[in-house]
Amino acid sequence: MTLEAIRYRSGSLQILNQLLLPRETVYDEIRSVRDGYEAIKSMKVRGAPAIAIVGCLSLAVELRAGAGAEDLVSFVRDSLCHLTSARPTAVNMGRAARELMEFTENESMEKNTEQLRDSVIGWIEEMLERDVNDNKKIGNYGAQHILSGVPRDSVTILTHCNTGSLATAGYGTALGVVRSLHMLGRLKRLYCTETRPYNQGARLTAYEAVAEGFPATLITDSMAALAMREKSITAVVVGADRVVANGDTANKVGTYQLAIAAKHHGIPFYVAAPSTSCDLSLESGRDIVIEERPAEELTSINGVPVAAPGIDVWNPAFDVTPHQLITGGIITELGVFLPSELQAALTGRLTAL
């Protein structure tokens, strides 16, 4: 069973409220761009691909309801600008906004308002199918690359945060690799970190693993290095919110220390991400803007205080893993590339932000 984080049919969008998982399964209606922005900002929906898809689909829903009749191009532009500001570290929303805006402006030269409305909605709806197809390619490429180093054995994977069906339109990126290994009968075990402070691993990845029958074990973030030493980890596979030209990768905070530990233990470290998560306009990770989240997300859990009152808090949502630590490769829908190969492989295929 593949979990369904996004339910869409023309004019109607529902998202699985991931803040309530695994205790409750609740779908929230998204009726407008404002609803989409709030769902992204509050992390009801998260994961770089899903952020872009939900953001753009929220625009499609509002367009289908007749919004933007006076100046549709301006309405699309203003809506995309607003959506892009919700979570700036993830590149997918910004890239989708730029490409959709360029498409809208070009189409507006030849079509009336209602024809343009249909064209824009059609472009957005195609994102869903493209994302699932790209994720399946990522899963297959990643699984084959990992298995090429262990041709006869089952493999044990360590992952961080949540990168499965709940973070995409379906199938997943890093967890898509795990899914492909499982479908091939070659997954011995998945170790998933709890991923503090938002617990995406404990709440979401563990939820997906149980629902889909993966052999999986949950560990705390601080157990990862020990697991690498004691549990015969074959590879570490994580997702990405932004991969820049030299291969430096922004992902959920805690990824950097996993890469350091993997390097120490001689374990291949992979990043799995669609090419839409790659930003060739930035030369290195130093240029990535890192989102900082509210202190309350660290000092309390489900509204219950767990830290001493008055303590100062630093709560970055992401960290940057230097490309030198990505030893396995960067898994995309186009293939698996070393960081040094990425820019040449993607140049011409992407529109730089």
Curated annotation (Swiss-Prot):
What are the record's GO terms for cellular component? cytoplasm; nucleus
Q: Which Gene3D superfamilies match?
A: translation initiation factor eif-2b, domain 1 (1.20.120.420), Translation initiation factor eif-2b, domain 2 (3.40.50.10470)
Report a single Gene Ontology molecular function.
Answer: S-methyl-5-thioribose-1-phosphate isomerase activity
State the superkingdom: Eukaryota
The reply to whether Cytoplasm figures as a keyword in the UniProt entry is yes
Q: Which residues constitute the catalytic centre?
A: D241 (proton donor)
**Where in the cell is the protein located?**
Cytoplasm; Nucleus
Q: Which GO terms describe its biological process?
A: L-methionine salvage from methylthioadenosine
* This protein's record includes keyword Nucleus: yes
Q: Which UniProt keywords apply?
A: Amino-acid biosynthesis, Cytoplasm, Isomerase, Methionine biosynthesis, Nucleus
Name the chemical reaction catalysed here: 5-(methylsulfanyl)-alpha-D-ribose 1-phosphate = 5-(methylsulfanyl)-D-ribulose 1-phosphate
Enzyme class, broadest EC rank: isomerase
What pathway annotation does it carry?
Amino-acid biosynthesis; L-methionine biosynthesis via salvage pathway; L-methionine from S-methyl-5-thio-alpha-D-ribose 1-phosphate: step 1/6
Positions of the record's site feature: Transition state stabilizer: C161
Supply the EC number(s).
5.3.1.23
Q: What Pfam family is a match, any one?
A: IF-2B
Family the entry assigns: Belongs to the eIF-2B alpha/beta/delta subunits family. MtnA subfamily.
**Function in brief:** Catalyzes the interconversion of methylthioribose-1-phosphate (MTR-1-P) into methylthioribulose-1-phosphate (MTRu-1-P).
Q: What is this protein called?
A: Methylthioribose-1-phosphate isomerase
Naturally occurring in which organism (per UniProt):
Danio rerio
Q: Taxonomic lineage of this organism?
A: Eukaryota, Metazoa, Chordata, Craniata, Vertebrata
